[in-house]
């Protein structure tokens, strides 16, 4: 049985690569739109999709067929049918676009902040249907939360898909109303709405996704795929020291220890002498693989499996970081960070102990000091040593990890310098590290 989502075609691997986050409130059509994009770009197995369509028809749920592409893919992944295909992707004329952390995941907010694949751009999906739209950008709406989040992450490239236009009879007035409301929110967050494309689409019917729709003669702009095609791939920092957070560790018979992760900065070559910290274990790189292809070297953005000689599986875990012996990743004794409080029922003071999610690591921490409270618009300090901070506040804080963890300054290594704080099953804050006080590391 072929996988429902096809692997990258040879043409795709020659194109510049972008990681796209698909964000928006539940039930606004994210999964359907992703399914539609994959289908329109030829990345869905026809035979497998026909089965899904027939099943949806039988159950009287024809509208679900495109969303079910992702459900089927997730099932395959959980059953281990497609181990390396944790991401799905599609091609535009100029780019190969990977969709990171498929929508609907319960840890989506956390994964957005510290996902192994950091987003270079975002597709914001908002429903035009009355009620759904108002909920999504209301005070408790995930749509609103996700927009705050992509702003906090510094994602500049954004497209807004105003979805479910078929449900409002392709009404231009409703589209303009949604556009005006979302623009207001974007402006508040410091985006320039005039530079952001809004596209009226129907994920179910396919309007304005790949081809211009006759149902929206009033819309003269580009299709969704045309907008995505204008996104710029970020510079990949090959000149920085090597940092590769570890997502997984395997012991493979006859090969030894294989660590899996994404190279965030620097270059990893076969034969390199590497160190994995916090455990401070040293080894040699025997081979590097991606998508079942052997590589001589891996660069930023590459998701790879690395066969390391001299390190045992028991010594390494998810959340450790691989670097080179001549530039060891920093294990943090204490960090100073700027945080945005996204959600908290009361207030946060010194002594508060949430869990920090940083790159692929999860570690208990304690906020030991509130240094200052900032004006969110200017970044200037408005209060020194506040007694507490609450939802919506931006502050500089000192944080002490209660277990060893690698953390770097955001300005040096962005993917290892941004984090989420979680508590009570929710994301409490998103932050960027300004200073790191390093712990002593003895190489073994």
Curated annotation (Swiss-Prot):
Keywords for the protein's UniProt record, in alphabetical order: Cytoplasm, Elongation factor, GTP-binding, Hydrolase, Magnesium, Metal-binding, Nucleotide-binding, Protein biosynthesis
Q: Where along the chain is Mg(2+) bound?
A: 31
A Pfam family that the UniProt record links to this protein:
GTP_EFTU_D2
Please name the GO terms that the record assigns under molecular function.
GTP binding; GTPase activity; translation elongation factor activity
* EC number from the UniProt entry: 3.6.5.3
Q: What is the organism field in this record? A: Pyrobaculum calidifontis (strain DSM 21063 / JCM 11548 / VA1)
Give the domain of life.
Archaea
Q: Which GO terms describe its cellular component?
A: cytoplasm
Q: Region labeled G4 — which residues?
A: 163-166
The answer to whether UniProt assigns keyword Amino-acid biosynthesis to this entry is no
Q: Which family does it belong to?
A: Belongs to the TRAFAC class translation factor GTPase superfamily. Classic translation factor GTPase family. EF-Tu/EF-1A subfamily.
The protein's matches in HAMAP family, at most eight in alphabetical order, are given as: EF_Tu_A (MF_00118_A)
Q: Which PROSITE patterns match?
A: G_TR_1, G_TR_2
Q: Which InterPro entries match?
A: EFTu-like_2, EFTU-type, G_TR_CS, GTP-eEF1A_C, P-loop_NTPase, T_Tr_GTP-bd_dom, TRAFAC_GTPase_members, Transl_B-barrel_sf
Where does this one sit in the cell? Cytoplasm
From the Swiss-Prot or TrEMBL record, give the protein name.
Elongation factor 1-alpha
Species classification: Archaea, Thermoproteota, Thermoprotei, Thermoproteales, Thermoproteaceae
């Amino acid at each position: 049985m072929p996988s429902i989502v096809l692997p990258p075609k040879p043409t795709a691997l020659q194109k510049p690569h972008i990681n796209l986050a698909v964000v928006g409130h539940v039930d606004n059509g994210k999964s359907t739109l992703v399914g539609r994009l994959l289908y329109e770009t030829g990345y869905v197995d026809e035979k497998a999709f026909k089965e899904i369509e027939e099943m949806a028809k039988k159950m009287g749920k024809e509208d679900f067929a495109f969303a079910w592409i992702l459900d089927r893919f997730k099932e395959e992944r959980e059953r281990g049918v497609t181990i390396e295909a944790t991401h799905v992707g599609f091609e535009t004329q100029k780019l190969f676009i990977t969709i990171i952390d498929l929508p609907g995941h319960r840890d989506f907010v956390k994964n957005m902040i510290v996902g192994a694949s950091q987003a270079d751009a975002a597709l914001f999906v908002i429903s035009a249907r009355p009620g759904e739209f108002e909920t999504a950008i209301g005070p408790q709406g995930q749509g609103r939360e996700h927009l705050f989040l992509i702003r906090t992450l510094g994602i500049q490239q954004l497209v807004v898909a105003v979805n479910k236009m078929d449900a409002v009879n392709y009404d231009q007035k409703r589209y303009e109303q949604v556009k005006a409301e979302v623009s207001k929110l974007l402006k508040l967050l410091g985006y320039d709405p005039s530079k952001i494309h809004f596209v009226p689409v129907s994920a179910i019917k396919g309007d304005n996704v790949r081809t211009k729709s006759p149902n929206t003669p009033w819309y003269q702009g580009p299709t969704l795929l045309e907008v995505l095609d204008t996104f710029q791939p970020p510079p990949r920092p090959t000149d920085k020291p090597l940092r590769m957070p570890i997502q997984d560790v395997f012991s493979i018979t006859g090969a030894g220890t294989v660590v899996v992760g994404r190279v965030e900065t620097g270059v990893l070559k076969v034969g390199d002498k590497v160190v994995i910290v916090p455990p401070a274990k040293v080894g040699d790189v025997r081979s590097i693989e991606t998508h079942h292809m052997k590589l001589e070297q891996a660069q930023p953005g590459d998701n790879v499996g690395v066969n390391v000689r001299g390190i045992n599986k028991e010594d390494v875990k998810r959340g450790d970081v691989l670097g080179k012996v001549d530039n060891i990743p920093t294990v943090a004794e204490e960090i100073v960070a700027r945080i945005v409080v996204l959600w908290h029922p009361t207030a946060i003071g010194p002594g508060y102990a949430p869990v920090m999610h940083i790159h692929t690591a999860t570690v208990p921490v304690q906020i030991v000091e509130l240094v200052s409270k900032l004006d969110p618009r200017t970044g200037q300090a408005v209060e020194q040593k506040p007694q507490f901070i609450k939802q919506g506040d931006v502050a500089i804080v000192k944080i002490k990890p209660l277990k060893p963890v690698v953390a770097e300054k955001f300005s040096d290594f962005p993917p290892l310098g941004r984090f989420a704080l979680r508590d009570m099953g929710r994301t409490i804050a998103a932050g960027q590290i300004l200073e790191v006080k390093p712990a002593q590391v003895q190489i073994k």
